[in-house]
Structure formats: structure tokens, C-alpha cells
Design a protein with these regions (language model features):
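Extracytoplasmic beta-strand/coil segments of soluble accessory domains associated
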Residues: 8, 23, 40-87
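Short strand-turn segments of transmembrane beta-barrel domains in outer membranes
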Residues: 111-119, 128-160, 170-171, 179-181, ...
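Transmembrane beta-barrel wall of Gram-negative outer-membrane proteins
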Residues: 148-175, 180-218, 241-256, 300-306, ...
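Membrane-embedded beta-barrel scaffold of Gram-negative outer-membrane proteins
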Residues: 254-275, 401, 405-413, 434-496, ...
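Gram-negative outer-membrane beta-barrel transporters
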Residues: 357-362, 370-371, 458-461, 477-555, ...
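C-terminal beta-signal and adjacent terminal beta-strands/loops
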Residues: 500, 547-554, 572-630
Length: 630
């Protein structure tokens, strides 16, 4: 009988390995015992990142990190086995990051980094990046869950030997109504399969994943409407005709050698959603596309003190139909914007690591990106055209191990994010194709036994936050910004079966020159997390405490959000082939807000309402399940 080995990814030794104090990894028991309201909360392993939701379980989440309201992913990029998930020139928002199709059991490890300091992170990575690695195999199982507010989940999966390799497949089906007046009626199906085969040079991995969801979103509502004849409480649904649907398929093949890797992928994506954020003008947004791309990277050891890695990557988005229409109660009224877009990009990068003395490491890298945009109008009176752009992003870093337990870091680099192709070709008010940002940070890492601690102070300057807004099919101006802040993280594993982790982040975001005010709306000023993980032969438990701090709602800081703290817990019992578990989410029934904005709405029967518009945090929720392993 083999003894089970419990692994905590946060406990890995990173002194002499990491290039910056803000880098890290999470895996193993860290993920297995984590209670989750929604799968996007897996990304909250990144210190300071908060994944919220304002429009139903099928829509991409709202992300906060390093003083950014990342909308749905603009400056935070995510990869799964080297395949990018962010969508550029999307029907709702640039860099749209929908991870709802992930099956939690498939994620084995998440490596994360912050800032603009690494050459293999390009578009959408100025705030940070997450690299998810999926499992190679899994014990055969079938399981089911039930919970409050119509939550149901069925899942099954396993691994079988095939042709000298291993074939792993998992599938899940979820339904959920939520606490909303209009039941969400979520119908979610996802499938993931992976074939792994050893080769003479390393390994081959071929993967296929599919995801389909339909839902009826209850969006943010004006707080002034709560308690009136049209809105009984914070869970009211002011437009019950809103609907959403997502279909996504991803196929990929990856070859992994000792000092190189190559990835090819193809994706099909079809999305549409009706929403009514102002409640007097319903819109229908849509996006249908094919994506193809790949990456090749190789490392070279020049001599014992100097190593080099170089890579190329490319991506092509053939967007057949993207835009927005005016609808009323789900019925088409008029088209606002409808385009076909072909967007291609290519990049080449190289990075050198030099260790002149035993305790000192220095890094220098260079990345060059080229983008080509071709926009064709699919209706009259909307702009079309073509444009190309390029950008070069240098990176520098240094790491000094002051002792065996302390390493100091300094990093600097340039990065970028692309803008929506439709805004780039708008002759009236064109946006910049590629927006540059400059980041730097200093930090330290302390590791002693099973305890580690890191501290980082960072700065990030963006030339412009001009962007194309899918809701209105128009360009929204935004001036240059300056951000800075600090991050503290800690992990302690006093015994093999018990671990604690904590993180606290603080940030300050300001416009450089804005007549309406210097404060950046939605820029969270602090966030924190504390966790306990307990894993033994028969029992597992996890506790997560998440704090989301205040942020300005308007540029002059005259209205601000309220802070909120949420506690989630999970417990499980294992016996032979049975695994029984339960999660209690929002343990203390916090009456917070998942998302808050400030703008004018016009609710029928109430007239214009100017002020806070929010979506309530979901109330205390109990879920329980059982898995049978065979």
C-alpha cells in the first residue's frame, strides 16, 4: 500500500528559481480543498485577485487586480496548457476572459505572475497572468451535488490506458437558479478530454474541451429602486427577458521536450447575450469566431552561468459576426453595429539569464509583437478598414540571494494590451491599436523550513485607457493612468496535514490629467485573503476568508463602494471508494455587493435614477455531494 503524499504548491521553494517577488504557484491540496461558489474563484489563488459577477453564471466574471477593474479580463491573461483563453475584439469587452467552461477537477496547478517583466506574456498581461496546467490522469469516479437555490451538479471522469499512453476524460452538467426573482435557469454542460503519450524526446499531449451554457441573467439594479413597487428587494429582476448563451470548443496538441515545447490550437466560439444595464434600452450582443494559433519555445544553456530561451507565437482570429443590436423584450428592433473582423498577430521573444556569482542572477529580455486588423462592415453607416501596428517590449530584472533564506528582487519592463479592432478603424475617434504600459517593482522573499513570506512594491503607468465599448458600439475615452501599491503574502505548513496562507494587497490608481477627477472608478484599493487547509487520511477541510476593500465609483471620489468580507468553508470525509463533502458559502450571510457601479438608469415606473447600481452578493448557500471512485 502506497502512502498518500500531500502536496501544497504554495510550499515550493522559489529562492533561486523565481524571477520576481510577485511570482508564485498553487497546486495540489491548495486547490483540492478550496470551497468555490463559482469556478472562476480558482483564479483567486493569485494574491489580490478578486473574481466577481454581475450578470449571471454564464457570463465572464469581473476581475480586480493591482488597482484595475479588469472588466472581463482586459489586463489579466490566462492560459490552459499554453492555450490562451482571453478573446480580443469581443462582442462585449476587449480581452473577455470566460473560464466558466473549466471543470475544477481538471486543474492540477496554477502558476501566476504580475506585471510586465516576462517575455512569454504578451497581450492582456500588464496586471498579471495565470498559467493553468491540467491533470495527466485522474481516478475513475462518478459524483453528484445538490444545493440551495436549485444547484445541481453531476460529474464523471477517469483515465484508461490507450495505445501506450493514457486517455483521461471528464464531463459535468450543472443547473442553478440562484436567489433571484427571475430564476437563472442555468443549463451548463462541459467536457474535457486529454491523451498523453510518452515519446523518445519527452511527451505528447492532445486535448479537446467543449462548453455550452444557457442562462437568464439578473443584472445589477439601481439601489434607489429597491423597496419600490417594481423591485421588492435586492434580488429583483427588472428585465426578465434577458438571456445568454455560450458555446466554445478548444482543440490543442502539445509536444514537450527536455528543453523545448511546441503547441498548436484551434478554437470555435459562439456567444450572444441580451442585457439591459440602463433598463430603458435592451441590447443583444453577439460574437462568433474561429481561432487558430501556436507557440514554439526552446531553452539553451550557453555555459554554466548563462542560459537563453527564445520563442515565437502567433494567433489568428476569424470573427465572422460581432456586434450589438437594439432589442425590446428579446425582439429585434434595429442593428447598432455589425462587423466581420480578421485579426492576426505574431511575436518573437528572447530572454537571457546570467549568474555571474553564486548569489546573483540577472535577466534581460526583449519581445516584439506585430498586429494586423481588417474590419469589414456588415451593415450600412458603420466604419470599416484595415490597420497594422507593432510594439517592442524590453524587460530587465535582478535577483540577489542575501542569505540562503532571503532573496531580493528588482524588475522593470514594458508591456501592452491591444484594443478592439472596430475602434481602431473608427475615423471619428480612433483608438490606439497597441497601448503601452511601463511597470517596475522591488521585492523580497523569505523562506525558512515550511514557512515562506514575500513582499512587493510595484508601479505601473499606462499611456492611455481609451477603449471600445461593446455595449454602445462606440469609443470611450480614457486618459493616462498611474498605479502603485504593495503586496504581502505568507504560507506556513506547521505539520504535513495542516497549512495556513494569507495575502494582503493595497493599491492606488490615479488619472494623470482628467477634468472630471483623478480617481479611477472601480480601482479596488485593498484586498485580502486568509486560508486554512487540513488534509488527513480520512478528513479534509478548507476555510477561505476573502476581503474586498473600498473603491471609488466616480472620478471625483464623491461616491465609494462599501468593503465586504466573505467566509467560505468546505469539509470532506473519505472512506475507501467513497468521498462525501459539503460546502457552506458566505457562512455569515454577508449582505455585501458582488459588483457596484454608479450611473443613470431609467426604470419603467420610476423614471431616471442617478446613483449606485449594484448586484447583491449571493446569500448563505449550502451544497453537498458524494463521489464514488472505482
Amino acid at each position: 500500500v502506497l502512502e498518500e503524499v500531500i502536496v501544497f504548491g504554495r510550499g515550493e521553494r522559489l529562492i533561486g528559481v523565481a524571477d520576481a517577488a510577485s511570482e508564485g504557484a498553487v497546486g495540489g491540496a491548495d486547490l483540492a480543498v478550496r470551497p468555490l461558489l463559482r469556478v472562476a474563484e480558482l483564479l483567486e489563488v493569485v494574491p489580490g485577485l478578486i473574481a466577481a459577477q454581475h450578470s449571471g453564471s454564464g457570463k465572464a466574471n469581473q476581475y480586480f487586480l493591482r488597482g484595475f477593474n479588469l472588466d472581463h479580463g482586459t489586463d489579466f491573461t490566462t492560459y490552459v496548457d499554453d492555450v490562451p483563453l482571453n478573446l480580443r475584439t469581443h462582442g462585449h469587452g476587449q480581452g473577455y476572459l470566460d473560464v466558466n467552461g473549466l471543470i475544477a477537477e481538471t486543474i492540477e496547478r496554477i502558476d501566476y505572475r504580475k506585471g510586465t517583466y516576462r517575455v512569454d506574456s504578451g497581450d492582456f498581461s500588464m496586471a498579471g497572468a495565470a498559467f493553468m496546467t491540467t491533470v495527466a490522469r485522474i481516478d475513475n469516479f462518478v459524483g453528484g451535488e445538490l444545493g440551495d437555490y436549485g444547484w445541481q451538479r453531476l460529474a464523471a471522469g477517469g483515465t484508461v490506458p490507450v495505445g501506450g499512453g493514457e486517455f483521461t476524460v471528464l464531463g459535468q452538467w450543472k443547473t442553478y437558479d440562484g436567489p433571484w426573482e427571475q430564476p437563472e435557469d442555468l443549463d451548463h454542460k462541459s467536457l474535457w478530454a486529454k491523451y498523453s503519450h510518452p515519446t523518445s524526446f519527452g511527451s505528447l499531449e492532445v486535448s479537446l474541451s467543449g462548453y455550452h451554457a444557457e442562462w437568464r441573467p439578473t443584472e445589477q439594479i439601481p439601489e434607489a429602486a429597491i423597496g419600490t413597487s417594481v423591485c421588492e428587494n435586492e434580488f429583483c429582476s427588472l428585465d426578465p427577458s434577458a438571456v445568454g448563451e455560450t458555446l466554445r470548443w478548444i482543440a490543442s496538441a502539445r509536444l514537450l521536450g527536455q528543453d523545448w515545447r511546441a503547441t498548436l490550437y484551434a478554437q470555435y466560439y459562439d456567444w450572444h447575450m441580451m442585457s439591459n444595464p440602463t433598463y430603458d434600452y435592451q441590447i443583444s450582443q453577439f460574437d462568433r469566431r474561429w481561432i487558430a494559433g501556436g507557440r514554439f519555445e526552446r531553452s539553451f544553456e550557453i555555459n554554466p552561468t548563462l542560459s537563453l530561451r527564445a520563442g515565437i507565437e502567433g494567433r489568428y482570429d476569424d470573427i465572422g459576426n460581432v456586434g450589438v443590436e437594439h432589442t425590446e423584450e428579446g425582439v429585434f428592433v434595429e442593428a447598432i453595429g455589425r462587423h466581420a473582423v480578421k485579426e492576426g498577430s505574431a511575436a518573437i521573444y528572447t530572454e537571457a539569464s546570467w549568474q555571474p556569482i553564486e548569489r546573483l542572477r540577472a535577466f534581460a529580455g526583449l519581445r516584439a509583437d506585430y498586429y494586423d486588423f481588417e474590419v469589414r462592415a456588415r451593415m450600412d453607416d458603420v466604419p470599416e478598414g484595415g490597420k497594422s501596428d507593432s510594439i517592442v517590449s524590453p524587460k530587465l530584472g535582478i535577483a540577489f540571494a542575501a542569505t540562503d533564506s532571503i532573496e531580493l528582487y528588482a524588475n522593470w519592463g514594458k508591456g501592452f494590451h491591444s484594443n478592439d479592432a472596430r475602434g481602431i478603424v473608427d475615423p471619428a475617434d480612433p483608438v490606439q491599436p497597441l497601448v503601452e504600459g511601463r511597470g517596475r517593482e522591488v521585492g523580497a522573499r523569505f523562506e525558512l523550513g515550511k514557512f515562506n513570506f514575500s513582499a512587493t512594491y510595484w508601479w505601473l503607468n499606462l499611456d492611455s485607457e481609451l477603449k471600445f465599448v461593446g455595449d454602445s458600439n462606440s469609443v470611450e475615452p480614457g486618459p493616462a493612468t498611474r498605479r502603485r501599491g504593495y503586496e504581502l503574502t505568507a504560507f506556513w505548513r506547521p505539520t504535513d496535514w495542516l497549512a495556513f496562507d494569507a495575502a494582503w494587497t493595497d493599491s492606488r490608481a490615479r488619472y494623470v490629467d482628467n477634468p472630471d477627477g483623478i480617481y479611477v472608478p472601480g480601482a479596488v484599493e485593498n484586498a485580502g485573503e486568509f486560508g486554512i487547509a487540513f488534509v488527513s487520511e480520512r478528513w479534509e477541510a478548507g476555510v477561505r476568508v476573502r476581503h474586498l476593500g473600498e473603491f471609488p465609483l466616480v472620478e471625483d471620489n464623491s461616491d465609494r463602494s462599501d468593503p465586504e468580507t466573505c467566509v467560505n468553508i468546505r469539509g470532506a470525509w473519505k472512506h475507501d471508494n467513497f468521498y462525501v463533502y459539503a460546502e457552506l458559502l458566505n457562512v455569515f450571510d454577508e449582505k455585501g455587493k458582488d459588483m457596484v457601479y454608479s450611473y443613470e438608469t431609467n426604470v419603467p415606473g420610476l423614471g431616471p435614477l442617478d446613483g449606485r447600481v449594484s448586484r447583491a452578493e449571493e446569500p448563505r448557500t449550502l451544497r453537498a455531494g458524494i463521489k464514488l471512485r472505482f
